Amino acid sequence: MQLFCWTKAASALMAAAVISLCIPTWTVADVKEGDTITKANMDQAGDLLIPGIKWFVERGMPVKVVPYKKVELPKLFKEATEKYSGQVKLSADGHEIYNYVAGLPFPAIDPNDPMVGFKIMWNQEQKPQYVDNVGTEWITELVNGRGELERTYGSQFWRRMMWTGRLYTDPKPVVPHNPAMRYTEQFGPLFIPNDLKGAGVLNNRYLGVDVPDDSYMYLPELRRARRISVANRSDAFWGADMDLDSLWGFNSKVSYWTFRLLAEKEILAPVHIGTYANRKVWCAQPDGKSGPLAFMPCNINWEKRPVYVIEGVPTAYSQYAYSKRIMYIDKDFWGMNFSEVFDQGGELWKLWFNMFEYVAKPYEGYPVKPLEGGKYNYEDAWAFTPHGMMADLQTVHSTKWDAPSGYVQPTDWVNEWYFNEATPINTERAYSVNFLIQSAR
């Protein structure tokens, strides 16, 4: 808010009187296609820039504005939403949904509903980004505030299989399991660095409100998979800035949090970035000279996006690194544009930052090397997420990724982004501790 004072001289009969009016006004954001927001003109964007992104712009990141492009729900997902959402019920505490089959559980959002925060988060949990399965190879770099590359991790896989809400591959809509599961995901095995070669993480998310995630980390030097305690899910792993609960912006159980809707608004976010697996998205390469520009994106598109701003506060942990999250959930596709994480003192600490290329196919000839058995018949747009990061804004440090690797040619990619493919790696057997260990050998 800015304060302007207006002074008006009185008439001749009241020459001695002066009326001083102080009128509060708010800066109105005025951003249009073709604008580039920088530190010099960032006031022009106003609250279209969230606090975490303002931190980046103040340190040199430009924001190139392109027109908003609506993201449509996938056809089968939209049909399932229309067919089944009317029967879905929310528990009184918001921790559980009943009668869910597929699609969005709560497509009609009423901001005056006292449970609106939980309903939005359940939509985020069953978002159309991940319906049956999804995966990609990835490379991650740890870069400090001087722009130095500290460490590199690479893997041929991050992959997730949904056990509920399935629409494309058999069995559907549910893969039977006791206890019932929502999804399983695997990170790894790593192929770099050498001291962690073969390491991987497996996470099982159960439907039961009080059933904690089953999470395991396989470390080759120990020759066994170690269970990750729920109490450690906010701890950074492998020396990176990210933690299990922060992956993709929010990766915790809905029932372990309380949520409230703070606002419905527009923000600037990268949803159609205009590139894919391209190292040139970054303002600079890690050279020890570029400072934080080495983990900032300069060459991507930003657009005004309608979002729900949700505050999440953890309630089920005896020890937890964060006091709260502020999450920016896209109204079109229910994915997380950004997630701001706050320390126990209430100060902004970290930012999770997704860069989407929401298209049916990211380039002509996609994919160069398809998965065995993959069809890639994508008529709908999907949430390709070729770049992103989690940045520590207090220590000026970042863990950024390219997925797939931007260091190699497409012919060298092993597994680039796929969605809803009926392949051997997307079966129940391929998401187990035994498979995690075997895949590392």
Q: At which residue positions do the language-model features occur?
A:
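A short, surface-exposed beta-strand/turn
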Residues: N204-V209, S323-F338
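Non-transmembrane domains of secretory- and envelope-associated proteins
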Residues: W26-A108, L222, R233-A269, I273, ...
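Bacterial N-terminal signal peptides
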Residues: S11-C22
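Short, surface-exposed coil-to-beta transition loops
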Residues: K197-G198, V211-P212, Y320-K324, N337, ...
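N-terminal secretory signal peptides that target proteins for export/translocation
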Residues: M1-T7
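Solvent-exposed N-terminal domain segments of exported/luminal and surface proteins
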Residues: D30-D213, L219
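Extended beta-strand-rich segments in extracellular/periplasmic secretory proteins, especially
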Residues: S85-V88, A92, Y153, W158-R159, ...
